[in-house]
Every structure is written in structure tokens, then in C-alpha cells.
From Swiss-Prot:
The record marks 87-88, 90-93 as: Cleavage. PANTHER family: PA14 DOMAIN-CONTAINING PROTEIN (PTHR24050), UROMODULIN-LIKE (PTHR24050:SF28). The modification Pyrrolidone carboxylic acid is found at residue 28. Keywords: Basement membrane, Calcium, Disulfide bond, EGF-like domain, Extracellular matrix, Glycoprotein, Pyrrolidone carboxylic acid, Repeat, Secreted, Signal. One of its GO terms (cellular component) is elastic fiber. This is EGF-containing fibulin-like extracellular matrix protein 2. It comes from Mus musculus. GO terms for biological process: aorta development; aorta smooth muscle tissue morphogenesis; artery development; elastic fiber assembly; negative regulation of vascular associated smooth muscle cell proliferation; positive regulation of aortic smooth muscle cell differentiation; positive regulation of collagen fibril organization; positive regulation of smooth muscle cell-matrix adhesion. Belongs to the fibulin family. N-glycosylated; contains mostly complex-type glycans. Not O-glycosylated. Cleaved by ELANE; produces a 50-55 kDa fragment. Cleaved by MMP2 and MMP9; produces several fragments.
Length: 443
């Protein structure tokens, strides 16, 4: 009730009430319609025409299109197109009719909410209903009564856009880094693999993973090495092994014969010799070891590489045996007058190609008589002059090898010692019959 109504007469009070009702029913300002109306997105209510009219977003939205894009208005919305794009307008100039306005009750819910069938206010998911203004490069996250535009993992916001972060600039990877849209990938150098954190690199044990080494494999940091067993050498490919021909490298590995075998070599000696740990060949003394076939009536004589069975009694008429190696010609026998009084049998062995001159045997007088003079000579068996006698003193002399000789060969030298005494007009001789065996080898 108006505050001054009580001062008016009754008829005037009635007219004032009617005028008040008429004023309330008259058209209001177009911006404030007498009924609540709602237009769809992209349209607004035109109070004059009582219709929804298109909103020109290109004029109403500041910087509707960014960068080099141009804004093209169309019914119910707008487009952002490149400036070089051609736009063909409707030839008849008729656009789609504006959607009809429909009356509805005002939204009783706060912004970002809408009523459901039970008239409860529920959150509007702007992200799923495309009611957001997030850029294509951004992610829309719905919030209670609102939404939020964020950059995906691996991106950062520069201006209005989300730009990929080059994680490789921050050296996250131990070896190599490959940048990817929104992410990155670490790679390792050959010989390494990614660790559990996918960033650091750990050494790969190629030997446990089937490295192509033929014989032996040694793992090292970031790689592996192939090695060969003793007696083999690594091939140029770095993986396979080939046998070393040790015998072809040197002729001094073995004294006699070198035989190459896979991964090794062996030394061999000729028959009659045994191999020593030093790879030298040593003569086997068959007479000492009993590995001979001499009878009881024979004597075993060993020489380099073999042995000889000789008769125990080697005395020939008119000589008689007085000991195992000595034959005596009796003075009572007339046949002994022109013969040496005794013959002593000796045996020795020398190697082939011995350096010369070489002292090989010393002759020694067993009896010394006062006033006697002894002379030594080679009586027989030195037809080629391979030996000569060098007298040392009155009672001894040395048999000398004058030239290198090659075996197998055998010499029987009669070394004579002539004893003379001018005062007594005495002359006698004795012979040392020396059998010299020359071995077939230089050892």
C-alpha cells in the first residue's frame, strides 16, 4: 500500500490502484522482458522482434581467433580459418532460421550446476558436453561447478598453447636421449641396456647372452673380448680361433722332430732315444736298462741310438784272453815276435757333425819303465785320415777327430804305443783296439 493512500478519497484510491495495475502490464524495456526467455548458445533474445537473433562473436569476443587466423561468423557460432581460406557465402542470403525461444523457469542452481529430475543441483561436466574453451592442445578437467584447462604431461603452457617439453635438454638420460611428443625415450650405446629406471645404462654381459666367441669370452665394460685357448690364435674376424703351427714358427722347439697338433705340438725322438722334459733327446742305454738281446756269451756295448752285442772272447790266435777286454800274445810263441804283445779292446761313441778338432779319447801307458820312451801312433783303421794322434807326454796321448763325420758309421782304430829303451836295445808295442761308433744324429 502506498504511504499516501490514506489521504485520498475512496474513488481516487480505486483509480490509483487500477493505474498501478496497468503500468505493471505495459511493455518493459527490451533488455528486461516481462517473461524469462532463453536462447541456445550463439543466440540472444531480441525484445523488439520477440525472437532469438544470432550473436556476432567476431565482434563481441575480444581476440576470438589467435595468430594468423581470421574470424568468420555464422549462425549460432563462429569459425577460425586461415586468412588465405576462401569463404563462399549463401547465394540466397538466407541462413538457417533462428531457433525459437522457449520459455523456461529460471535456473535455481549456481553457475556450473543444473537441476536434475529430482530438482537437485548436479555438476555440469563442461568437458564432456563441449561447454569449455580449452585449446586442442590442452586437456579439460571437470571441477565442481567449473572446469580447468591444463597441459598434458610432457607439455608446458607458452601463451595460450601447450608446447612439447624437450626433456633431452635436461640430460635425464645417461647415454642418448630421443625426444618424443609429450615424452622422451632413453637409449644406450652398444654393449649396454636400460636399467630399471629406464634412464641409466648398465653393462650387458655379452658372454652370458651368447657372444659369438668360438673358444673363450671375457666381458668388459660396454663390450666383450674373444680369446683363444693356448695353441690357438684369434682370427681377423675377432671371434674365431685358428690353430698355431708352432713347428712352423721355429726349428728349435724340438731337438729332433716337431709334430703340430690342434692347439699344441709334440716333440719326438728317433728310435733308441727318449724325450726329456727339456724337449731334448737322450740316448737310451739299453745295456744298462736290460733292453737288449745279447746272450750270456756276449757283451752289450751301448752307443748313440743303439747297442751292439760283441763276443766276450775277442782274442784271435796266437792271442789268448787274459781278461774281459785284454788279449795277450805269449812271448813263448814264435808267432808273437812280430806282433804287439797285447791288444786291449775299447768302445766309444760320438755324435754326427761334431765340431772339430775334437779330443775324443786319451791313451795312457799303464806301466812306466826307467829309461823307456813311448811313442803313439794310429796303426790301422784311419784310411781317410779322419783322426790323428797328439802326444801329450811320454806316457799319454790324445786321439783327435780331425774332420766332421756323419753317422751311422763305425771305425775300428788300432792305436799303438811303442816302448823303446836305447840303452837296453829294447823295443815292444801294445795295441788299444778302439771301436768308434758314430751316431746318426747330432745328439
Amino acid at each position: 500500500m502506498l504511504p499516501f493512500a490514506s489521504c485520498l478519497p475512496g474513488s481516487l484510491l480505486l483509480w490509483a490502484f487500477l493505474l498501478l495495475l496497468l503500468g505493471a502490464a505495459s511493455p518493459q524495456d527490451p533488455e528486461e522482458p516481462d517473461s524469462y526467455t532463453e536462447c541456445t548458445d550463439g543466440y540472444e533474445w531480441d525484445a523488439d522482434s520477440q525472437h532469438c537473433r544470432d550473436v556476432n562473436e567476431c565482434l563481441t569476443i575480444p581476440e576470438a581467433c589467435k595468430g594468423e587466423m581470421k574470424c568468420i561468423n555464422h549462425y549460432g557460432g563462429y569459425l577460425c580459418l586461415p586468412r588465405s581460406a576462401a569463404v563462399i557465402s549463401d547465394l540466397h542470403g538466407e541462413g538457417p532460421p533462428p531457433p525459437a525461444a522457449h520459455a523456461q523457469q529460471p535456473n535455481p542452481c549456481p553457475q556450473g550446476y543444473e537441476p536434475d529430475e529430482q530438482e537437485s543441483c548436479v555438476d555440469v561436466d563442461e568437458c564432456t558436453q563441449a561447454l569449455h574453451d580449452c585449446r586442442p592442445s590442452q586437456d579439460c578437467h571437470n571441477l565442481p561447478g567449473s572446469y580447468q584447462c591444463t597441459c598434458p604431461d610432457g607439455y608446458r603452457k607458452i601463451g595460450p598453447e601447450c608446447v612439447d617439453i624437450d626433456e633431452c635438454r635436461y640430460r635425464y638420460c645417461q647415454h642418448r636421449c630421443v625426444n618424443l611428443p609429450g615424452s622422451f625415450r632413453c637409449q644406450c650405446e652398444p654393449g649396454f641396456q636400460l636399467g630399471p629406471n629406464n634412464r641409466s645404462c648398465v653393462d650387458v654381459n655379452e658372454c652370458d647372452m651368447g657372444a659369438p666367441c668360438e673358444q673363450r669370452c671375457f666381458n668388459s665394460y660396454g663390450t666383450f673380448l674373444c680369446r683363444c685357448n693356448q695353441g690357438y690364435e684369434l682370427h681377423r674376424d675377432g671371434f674365431s680361433c685358428s690353430d698355431i703351427d708352432e713347428c712352423g714358427y721355429s726349428s728349435y722347439l724340438c731337438q729332433y722332430r716337431c709334430v703340430n697338433e690342434p692347439g699344441r705340438f709334440s716333440c719326438h725322438c728317433p728310435q733308441g732315444y727318449q724325450l726329456l722334459a727339456t724337449r731334448l733327446c737322450q740316448d737310451i742305454d739299453e745295456c744298462e736298462t736290460g733292453a737288449h738281446q745279447c746272450s750270456e756269451a756276449q757283451t752289450c756295448v751301448n752307443f748313440h741310438g743303439g747297442y751292439r752285442c760283441v763276443d766276450t772272447n775277442r782274442c784271435v790266435e796266437p792271442y789268448v784272453q787274459v781278461s774281459d777286454n785284454r788279449c795277450l800274445c805269449p812271448a813263448s810263441n814264435p808267432l808273437c815276435r812280430e806282433q804287439p804283445s797285447s791288444i786291449v779292446h775299447r768302445y766309444m761313441s760320438i755324435t754326427s757333425e761334431r765340431s772339430v778338432p775334437a779330443d775324443v779319447f786319451q791313451i795312457q801307458a799303464t806301466s812306466v819303465y826307467p829309461g823307456a820312451y813311448n811313442a803313439f801312433q794310429i796303426r790301422s783303421g784311419n784310411t781317410q785320415g779322419d783322426f790323428y794322434i797328439r802326444q801329450i807326454n811320454n806316457v799319454s796321448a790324445m786321439l783327435v777327430l780331425a774332420r766332421p763325420v756323419t753317422g751311422p758309421r763305425e771305425y775300428v782304430l788300432d792305436l799303438e804305443m811303442v816302448t823303446m829303451n836305447s840303452l837296453m836295445s829294447y823295443r815292444a808295442s801294445s795295441v788299444l783296439r778302439l771301436t768308434v761308433f758314430v751316431g746318426a744324429y747330432t745328439f
